[in-house]
Amino acid sequence: MIAELEGIDIRENEALKHYTYTQVGGPADFLAFPRNHYELSRIVDYANHNHIPWMVLGNASNLIVRDGGIRGFVIMFDKLNTVRLNGYTLEAEAGANLIETTKVAKFHSLTGFEFACGIPGSIGGAVFMNAGAYGGEIAHIFLSAKVLTPEGKIKKISAREMAFGYRHSVIQETGDIVISAKFALKPGNHDSICQEMNRLNHLRQLKQPLEFPSCGSVFKRPPGHFAGQLIMDANLKGHRVGGVEVSKKHAGFMINVADGSAKDYEELIAHVIKTVEQTSGVRLEPEVRIIGESL
């Protein structure tokens, strides 16, 4: 226990595989769950003062944590999950579940968030990655965000400053961490919103291997192509390394079918990139982030 951080939920040498969608990942030296911005500031100030590395893990849905784990503090925002409405503006803390946030918009007959109704993860991660699906993306509704800088300061970033691109935002370079974000929604027809969300969720269930642990879509969409189709054309559907395989249901996904490891994921990703480039001339770029230390 760290005396200076008494009262904050901090777990030492905690295996991260229990917190990731892939169900892989080694231990964090310190895994912290702040309940509010004050506790978050205490953790970051302590880490910076003592030259201890720190990072925010989010909901770890489009992420692979290596088997050696992560040194220093890993901060999870599970308890920072408030969602508020002010007219047609929705404000959500970074730890708010993205799918549950879309349900809040639906309940209040607000349209604009339907595209995200089946995307796993957190609000903070969705902004970081400019998450999107079925023609929609976070950039289309984003207004602004409060972020925590690497130095521990809080500042506001506008939509223009966020410089969104395909699965990209400026904070991927700056290291700023989203604390909360505001989104501009519009009044809509409740039944129409429900129908659209039901349609998109049905498509996901038909096409995606939701019954297995995975990191979601592994590769970015290459211009003029679909990653899943290129992987199928390379005869890699069902290809397996250790306990991880290319999904037979959707080749753009890699699933943990038999107690796989992060090493299995990395080797399979590398094999797919190499083989697809050999067969099609297209070099796939991972969408999934890989962090931490190897064993």
Curated annotation (Swiss-Prot):
| Catalytic activity reported | UDP-N-acetyl-alpha-D-muramate + NADP(+) = UDP-N-acetyl-3-O-(1-carboxyvinyl)-alpha-D-glucosamine + NADPH + H(+)
Reported cofactor(s): FAD
According to the record, the signal peptide region is none
Kindly list the GO CC terms recorded for this protein: cytosol
List the subcellular locations: Cytoplasm
GO MF terms listed in the record are: FAD binding; UDP-N-acetylmuramate dehydrogenase activity
- The EC class name is oxidoreductase
Pathway(s) the chain acts in: Cell wall biogenesis; peptidoglycan biosynthesis
Under Enzyme Commission nomenclature, its number is: 1.3.1.98
InterPro entries for the chain = FAD-bd_PCMH (IPR016166), FAD-bd_PCMH-like_sf (IPR036318), FAD-bd_PCMH_sub1 (IPR016167), FAD-bd_PCMH_sub2 (IPR016169), MurB (IPR003170), MurB_C (IPR011601), MurB_C_sf (IPR036635), Oxid_FAD_bind_N (IPR006094)
- Chief localisation class: cytoplasm
Q: Does the keyword Cell wall biogenesis/degradation apply?
A: yes
| A GO BP annotation | cell division
Indicate the segments forming the FAD-binding PCMH-type domain, all copies. 23-188
Enumerate the Pfam families for this protein.
Answer: FAD_binding_4 (PF01565), MurB_C (PF02873)
Task: List, from the UniProt record, the residues annotated as the active site of this protein.
Answer: R167, S217, E287
Q: Which family does it belong to?
A: Belongs to the MurB family.
Q: What does this protein do?
A: Cell wall formation.
Q: What is this protein called?
A: UDP-N-acetylenolpyruvoylglucosamine reductase
